[in-house]
Amino acid sequence: MFSFIDDIPSFEQIKARVRDDLRKHGWEKRWNDSRLVQKSRELLNDEELKIDPATWIWKRMPSREEVAARRQRDFETVWKYRYRLGGFASGALLALALAGIFSTGNFGGSSDAGNRPSVVYPIE
């Protein structure tokens, strides 16, 4: 009887295939040249960080002036693009309103639903 289990590659074969594909397409070089990997290697090889992590972190904490400057720069960036942000927000609001109107079929939504008729008939 034929078995599909024989066709399943082993873990080592899968690893080798993936490694070959990464090499073939140049992803390994891109990964090794990425900022994330370079920064990780730099931190792993930092002797001061290995000896005293608390002092290492404390030295790199930004001062109040640096935090204030960053906050000011961020605010200026947002202020610079305020018209674009306003346009995006108003467009999103308009899209939500139109979606509500078209999905319910009226402006009220549930007022014309079957369980709550908008026309009230007198009881006889």
From Swiss-Prot:
Signal peptide: none annotated. It is found in: Cell inner membrane. Disulfide bonds: none annotated. It comes from Cereibacter sphaeroides. Component of the ubiquinol-cytochrome c reductase complex (complex III or cytochrome b-c1 complex), which is a respiratory chain that generates an electrochemical potential coupled to ATP synthesis. The chain crosses the membrane at residues 85-102. GO terms for molecular function: oxidoreductase activity. Its main location: membrane. One of its GO terms (cellular component) is plasma membrane. This is 14 kDa peptide of ubiquinol-cytochrome c2 oxidoreductase complex. It is a single-pass membrane protein. Keywords: Cell inner membrane, Cell membrane, Electron transport, Membrane, Oxidoreductase, Respiratory chain, Transmembrane, Transmembrane helix, Transport.
